[in-house]
Amino acid sequence: MTKEQAQINISELVERFNEQLVSYKKSEYNETLTRRDFIDPFFKALGWDMDNSNGYAEAYREVIHEDKVKIGGATKAPDYSFRLSGGKRLFFVEAKKPSVFVKDEILPSYQIRRYGWSAKLPISIITDFEEFAVYDCTKKPNTADKASTARVKYLTFKDYSKEFDFLWDTFSKEKVLKGSFDKFVASDTHKKGTTTVDKEFLQSLDHWRTLIAIDICKQNKNLDEDEINFAVQQTIDRLIFLRIAEDRSI
């Protein structure tokens, strides 16, 4: 897919969406239809093999639908995981139906940021085709955050034409393989106040160590200082082991 043809294809999607916008905004028009009618063709125009038409083995698929991410002991499923050959994740895309207000609703933004944060991805996307929001996932999400928190780019479908260079240069498969995605991540998402999930985990250990020590003292008044320290360290070691196991999907 050339850049010129991709722009034509996306322009046709925009025109069709605009012509029937009222119908698409109705609640009956669901997420599955949105994905099939608009989101899949949108990313296909950007060069991604959305349905594995190349017949690649599972480990080499470019796009995984309903990928698996462990969050707090539970397994969640982002709608799309875009990957390099060999399975390295680049970014998630979470699809919504057009009746969802992507710009202002808190839950969708928290959801995608939580997925990206847990998977250690730099950015991820929410889109219902009508709206397209890119989020920095290196900043730990909080349920009290606004929908605009950590959002580094926001477009509506009417912006796709004038912003096509951005879409192509950042998210097309061709440009991703040439490093443009990495340049965008480096320039726009590594901001002051961001941290990684590993750094956050390590920072939490000191706080947990104190809480664990206090609890052990309360529950075991007969233990001396060395015994308490041993019990605390043993508990911390188990937490670290569980974290490593989670990262390795064990």
What are these regions (language model features)?
Residues 2, 30, 53-55, 91:
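Generic signature of intrinsically disordered, low-complexity, basic-rich segments
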Residues 27, 31, 69-70, 101:
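Short secondary-structure transition/capping motifs
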Residues 37-44, 114:
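Residue-level detector of alpha-helical secondary structure
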Residues 46-51, 245-250:
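Short helix-capping/linker segments at secondary-structure and domain boundaries
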